[in-house]
């Protein structure tokens, strides 16, 4: 839980045969334990996290929240740790990552600006995260209209994912996945259609 800023400019990544140049990357952290503000500014990732949070306890805190729905999948032997209040919101935008994905051989590439929003409150064990991914690749597969939500408004965790997979020939596969978790049970529904005409 630091306060201050880190600025990096003119950072180059070189791998054969590609390279990536990062003009700027700045992280600025201000505030105190109950009112923090983290701002990220760069060519690839921009955004902010605001509220009360502790970097050392965010993951254990989320695990504790998820344990209420699927305890069999959460490690019950986690070390007991004093968990601070984690009540924050976030907004992140991801720019085109083609250059850095190619250079670092990453399996995921953003082609147009995407956005991630969300909030989490461990005192009430409530969260909601959304991701808007207009156009992206996973490996050589191309996708558009990606939308992901994960939340727990009532007595279960809900996950929804929609995306369209397409190819250069115009074939489109429309995918819709819904899942929810409660009482150590995960229910999943997958829908898959395409625009191919029957012969």
For each feature predicted by the language model, list its residue ranges.
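Hydrophobic lipid-interacting interfaces of membrane-associated proteins
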Residues: 1-60, 67-75, 90-199
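Key residue(s) within conserved catalytic/signature motifs
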Residues: 77-79, 84
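Short structural boundary motif marking the start of a folded domain
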Residues: 86-88
